[in-house]
Swiss-Prot record:
Organism from which the protein derives: Homo sapiens (Human)
Keyword tags: Activator, Cell cycle, Cytoplasm, DNA-binding, Metal-binding, Nucleus, Repeat, Transcription, Transcription regulation, Zinc, Zinc-finger
PROSITE patterns xrefs: BTB, ZINC_FINGER_C2H2_1, ZINC_FINGER_C2H2_2
Coiled coil stretches, renumbered: none
SUPFAM superfamilies, alphabetized: beta-beta-alpha zinc fingers, POZ domain
InterPro entries per UniProt: BTB/POZ_dom (IPR000210), SKP1/BTB/POZ_sf (IPR011333), Znf_C2H2_sf (IPR036236), Znf_C2H2_type (IPR013087), ZnFinger_BTB_dom_contain (IPR050457)
GO CC terms, sorted: cytoplasm; cytosol; microtubule cytoskeleton; nucleoplasm; nucleus
Tissue: Highly expressed in normal epidermis and in other epithelial tissues, including in colon and lung. Tends to be down-regulated in colon, lung and skin cancer tissues.
Signal is among the record's keywords: no
BP-aspect Gene Ontology terms: negative regulation of cell population proliferation; negative regulation of transcription by RNA polymerase II; positive regulation of transcription by RNA polymerase II; regulation of cell cycle; regulation of cytokine production; regulation of immune system process
Name used for this protein in its record: Zinc finger and BTB domain-containing protein 49
Length: 765
């Protein structure tokens, strides 16, 4: 190979591997939430759109570009084409690829799409089905132009090219030698059509496109490196393509026919002529010398389509086996095979033994086509064959019996039983059972997060993390704990939570012997012994042992309070504080109806312990008339505080306004009693003429009874025991307010005032 071509192939191969691993990529394309990493130089080299985009956004920092492309697979295939020169075009994706290439202005892809569309609109022969031309030339069309040039060593390429030129000369001199297109028609149509007509139909194919589009393809493609040492059976698959390139028509114009012939075997039986099923793949040998010359390089030839062809052929053969398993179709198929075998035996006799053997391997083993040598004789054989094909679809595990459709999936499943983890991280030494898990793990070391949440813009290293994260925005918690009923957004968190209910503590600390039921708790505990604090705050430099501790600390700088109380809308920085706060709401709601009941019980208890005389009541009159500005200590219950401020304050104002006009007469009466002279004038009471009807009555409207009197006596005694200082000094001191007893409701204070007035009347008598 040319040194320049080798150098360019190696360069593009390395760039492609870097893109797959996500290394040294300087831009990211986001299409509907799916991220594609690539190199700007490669994108700009193939696309005029990307070239202008990168030049105009040179000052952009993040290098993330959101593309308005309708189909995600279109951009993915175009990126693969840029790095591998490989593009799969078929009837399903041709329109998508054409639209995407026009949007991104990729001229090479546009040329390939137009060439594909031209080949699909070729004038068909009379007997050909309408969809046969397009289907036969669609899947492997791009490979046809590079079949000769891309896989051979230089000396073999020269030899094959010389043979091809010789074949071209022979074909021009003998136009009736190779009617390769006639094999696509029925036996009756072959007899009616002239041989030069078939040649003309094949030469009219406008499929002459340059080879330089595909010369670099297999040198660095994944399949080339992955299956370079594959079994010989896969190599035989490409032999029909190679035989046709050297035998059919001209060098360039025969290649579409060869590809179409190989694809024709993949078609379902109803679209194929009757004589085609039993006919060998290459039943015509226009020139024996050309076959012998190119047979050697054919065996070394490898097409990238081999894997896809085998999979598609297998599915087609299954469908065919199911159809021919019916009795009616069995008879018809046998008749067609017998009639077709008569026409093909004469052609097959001219071939050598080696050619026959290779053709049988290709037609029977790889393409699963029923040839003349393997034609079933009875319906029972067809049924056995269909059962064999059905059994091949399932690969069962020997240990648990779980079925799989592909052996590779079965191989991965077996590792779950054996515990084999062949993939090792070269950074931390952790092992994985699958290569994809290792690749995701490596992103955590490099910090790469290619997956983005479309709602909040948060980035993740794995696609599964995005799916689990999206549930947070919806607030849905479908996974419930069957023990405590707590809900979780994903199953892994629920599984971790269930370990808290188990009493088994299998994780033990080696240093102190403390056990834990979860491994993460043990890891966090070990940090206390080592003193390691790997997480540091970028704002203040403080270090922490866990990442969660660092996140909570950062909230002190940002002021973020993500946890909100649903009752009072108060926000908190930690979820534990929110849970304690919610318990306060529940406790307050349970205790508020029982406040008065607790107070009444306390008053009755104190009444039984103490019995007061009339003299004690006269001594306790000093606490009855407090200034309006003095307030009793506030109880934690807010409802009681409001009741005291609104109701009792008005009662005291009314009492003072009625007592003050009688101060002079009361002073004369108190002068007769030396024990009363020491009391201040503020404590003087009104005479007997006081009208009870002017004082506010309780809500019930009933006067105080004997039970109310007992309650008042105990309350006054409790107030008197707090100290012997005058009321004025006690009211103004902070210590007195802090050491004050229970809070009394407004009804109790009203009762105290009424009893004081009654005691004064008794003293006057």
């Amino acid at each position: 190979m040319d040194p320049v071509a080798t150098h360019s192939c190696h360069l593009l191969q390395q760039l492609h591997e870097q893109r797959i691993q996500g290394l040294l990529c300087d831009c990211m394309l986001v299409v509907k939430g799916v991220c594609f990493k690539a190199h700007k130089n490669v994108l700009a080299a193939f696309s005029q759109y990307f070239r202008s985009l990168f030049q105009n956004s040179s000052s952009q920092k993040n290098d993330v570009f959101h593309l308005d492309v309708k189909n995600v697979s279109g951009i993915g295939q175009i990126l693969d084409f840029m790095y591998t020169s490989h593009l799969d075009l078929n009837q399903d994706n041709i329109q998508v690829m054409l639209d995407t290439a026009q949007c991104l202005q990729v001229q090479n892809v546009l040329s390939l799409c137009h060439t594909f569309l031209k080949s699909a609109t070729v004038v068909q022969p009379p007997g050909m089905p309408c969809n046969s031309t397009l289907s036969l030339q669609s899947t492997l069309t791009p490979d046809a132009t590079c079949v000769i040039s891309e896989n051979y060593p230089p000396h073999l390429l020269q030899e094959c090219s010389a043979d091809a030129q010789q074949n071209k000369t022979l074909d021009e001199s003998h136009p009736h030698a190779s009617p390769s297109v006639n094999r696509h028609h029925s036996a009756g149509e072959i007899s009616k059509q002239a041989p030069d007509t078939s040649d003309g139909s094949c030469t009219e194919l406008p499929f002459k496109q340059p080879n330089y589009y595909y010369k670099l393809r297999n040198f660095y493609s994944k399949q080339y490196h992955k299956h370079a040492a594959g079994p010989s059976q896969e190599r035989v698959v490409e032999q029909p393509f190679a035989f046709s390139t050297s035998t059919d028509l001209t060098t360039v114009e025969s290649q579409p026919c060869a590809v179409s012939h190989s694809e024709c075997i993949l078609e379902s039986p109803e679209h194929l002529p009757s004589n085609f099923l039993a006919q060998p793949v290459n039943d015509s040998a226009p020139h024996p010398e050309s076959d012998a010359t190119c047979q050697q390089p054919v065996k070394q030839m490898r097409l990238k389509k081999a894997i896809h062809l085998k999979k598609l052929n297998f599915l087609k053969s299954q469908k065919y086996a199911e159809q021919v398993s019916e009795p009616k179709s069995d008879d018809g198929l046998t008749k067609r095979l017998e009639s077709a075998s008569k026409n093909t035996l004469e052609k097959a006799s001219s071939q050598s033994a080696e050619e026959k053997e290779s053709e049988e391997v290709v037609s029977c083993e790889n393409f699963n086509c029923i040839s003349e040598t393997e034609r079933p004789e009875d319906p029972a054989a067809l049924e056995d064959q269909s059962q064999t094909l059905q059994s091949q679809r399932q690969y069962a595990c020997e240990l648990c019996g779980k079925p799989f459709k592909h052996p590779s999936n079965l191989e991965l499943h077996k590792r779950s039983h054996t515990g084999e983890k062949p993939f090792e991280c070269n950074i931390c030494g952790k092992h994985f059972s699958q290569a994809g898990n290792l690749q995701t793990h490596l992103r955590r070391h490099s910090g790469e997060k290619p997956y983005i949440c479309e709602i909040c813009g948060k980035r993740f290293a794995a696609s599964g993390d995005v799916q689990r994260h999206i549930i947070i925005h919806s607030g849905e918690k479908p996974h419930l704990c069957d023990i405590c009923g707590r809900g979780f957004s994903n199953f892994s968190n629920l599984k971790e939570h269930k370990k808290t209910h188990t009493a088994d503590k299998v994780f033990t600390c080696d240093e102190c012997g403390k056990s834990f039921n979860m491994q993460r708790k043990l890891v966090k505990h070990r940090i206390r012994h080592t003193g390691e604090r790997p997480y540091s705050c970028s704002a203040c430099g403080k270090c922490f042992g866990g990442s969660g501790d660092l996140r909570r600390h950062v909230r002190t700088h940002t002021g973020e309070k993500p946890y909100t109380c649903e009752i009072c809308n108060k926000c908190f920085t930690r979820s534990a504080v929110l849970r304690r706060h919610k318990k306060m709401h529940c406790k307050a709601g349970d205790e508020s109806p029982d406040v008065l009941e607790e107070l009444s019980q306390a008053i009755e208890t104190s009444d039984l312990e103490k019995s007061q005389s009339s003299d004690s009541f006269s001594q306790d009159t000093s606490v009855t008339l407090m200034p309006v500005s003095v307030k009793l200590p506030v109880h934690p219950v807010e409802n009681s505080v409001a009741e005291f401020d609104s109701h009792s304050g008005g009662s005291y104002c009314k009492l003072r306004s009625m007592i003050q006009p009688h101060g002079v007469s009361d002073q004369e009466k108190l002068s007769l009693d030396p024990g009363k002279l020491a009391k201040p004038q503020m404590q003087q009471t009104q005479p007997q003429a006081y009208a009870y009807s002017d004082v506010d009555t309780p809500a019930g409207g009933e006067p105080l009874q004997a039970d109310g009197m007992a309650m008042i006596r105990s309350s006054l005694a409790a107030l008197d025991n707090h100290g012997g200082d005058p009321l004025g000094s006690r009211a103004s001191s902070t210590t007195y307010r802090n050491s004050e007893g229970q809070f009394f409701s407004s009804m109790t204070l009203w009762g105290l005032a009424m009893k004081t007035l009654q005691n004064e009347n008794e003293l006057d008598q």
